[in-house]
């Protein structure tokens, strides 16, 4: 599980009191939340990504990288070696698509995508929401950089083969 933490304590309390989580739909998530509220109280209060192993919630890994300094929409690759995520729009109207190599803790910028003018002029938010395909070679994103909202499929097969040779 990947967790973005700003101020986790309040969020954990809110989630623990949510009757939806009381059902046995997400027992692993509830286990981590309960464990976290007791054991991570003062450990994850920074703007960073954290990995929590559902089988060993006490094993908390903070992803230390200057490019992973804001909330996004992360997803772990099918082989569990990479994380794809996006950033929110910066002051110039660009969002980044980022690939984290979990083995080397290195981040690659796959691309930067400009928010469509009509969205920025109306102060509307828009995110890339990157998702892996089953092979781990393709990324699907939502983007407005061509002037309208569209879905795009990006092949990262060549980048992955270069990373694996390093």
Where are these regions (language model features)?
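Membrane-proximal basic amphipathic "stem/tether" segments
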Residues: 8-45
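Blade-terminus and WD-like Trp-Asp/Gly-His loop motifs, strongest in beta-propeller folds
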Residues: 1-4, 73-83, 90, 129-138
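Surface-exposed loop/turn elements that mediate protein-protein interactions on large endomembrane-trafficking
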Residues: 17-27, 46-64, 99-112, 158-162
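Conserved blade-ending motifs and adjacent loop-strand segments that build the rim/top face
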Residues: 61-75, 105-132
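Blade-level signature of beta-propeller repeat domains, shared across WD40, Kelch, NHL, RCC1
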Residues: 124-166
């Amino acid at each position: 599980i990947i967790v973005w933490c700003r101020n986790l304590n309040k969020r954990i309390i809110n989630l623990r009191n949510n009757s939806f989580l009381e059902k046995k739909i997400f027992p692993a998530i509830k286990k981590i939340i309960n464990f976290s509220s007791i054991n991570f109280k003062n450990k994850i209060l920074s703007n960073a990504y954290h990995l929590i192993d559902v089988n060993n919630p006490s094993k908390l890994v903070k992803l230390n990288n200057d490019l992973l300094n804001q909330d996004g929409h992360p997803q772990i690759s099918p082989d569990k070696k990479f994380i794809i995520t996006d950033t929110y729009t910066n002051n110039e109207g660009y969002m980044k698509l980022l690939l984290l190599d979990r083995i080397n803790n290195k981040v690659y910028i796959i691309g930067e995508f400009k928010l469509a003018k009509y969205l920025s002029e109306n102060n509307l938010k828009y995110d890339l929401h990157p998702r892996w395909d089953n092979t781990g070679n393709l990324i699907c994103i939502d983007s407005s950089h061509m002037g309208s909202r569209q879905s795009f499929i990006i092949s990262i097969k060549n980048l992955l083969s270069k990373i694996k040779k390093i």
